[in-house]
């Protein structure tokens, strides 16, 4: 089986560096699935979850790894994927209560209909909170199927 090297980094540092059988990422136009020997690609990322299926020799199957990115850039080469994220974290480090509170706060700001800049900021915060909550739901569903 082929493998592809994956590197996920943010301004804070490296989050993941390893080999994968498959990677899924939230590109601007929708989720993309990337396998080894994928055609070169450069695209923006929107807030959401990155799923990495680790490469394992033989017929063994490893648990998927989940990461949250707040946006950034995805570069794909046939044998390497680089994700340069604005903010990135392991999904296990996400705080569901904090994300829910951020979602509520952003919705309240949108209801106030303040300036265009404040509306854009609230929309970005709402998108980030919704993406975190969606990723947490995916992880819960994945845990139930194991």
Feature map (PLM): residue ranges:
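Compact, glycine-rich, soluble single-domain proteins
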Residues: 5-100, 105
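DNA-contacting interfaces and partner/effector-binding or oligomerization modules
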Residues: 1-3
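Acidic/glycine-rich phosphate/pyrophosphate-binding loops and surrounding catalytic core
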Residues: 89-146
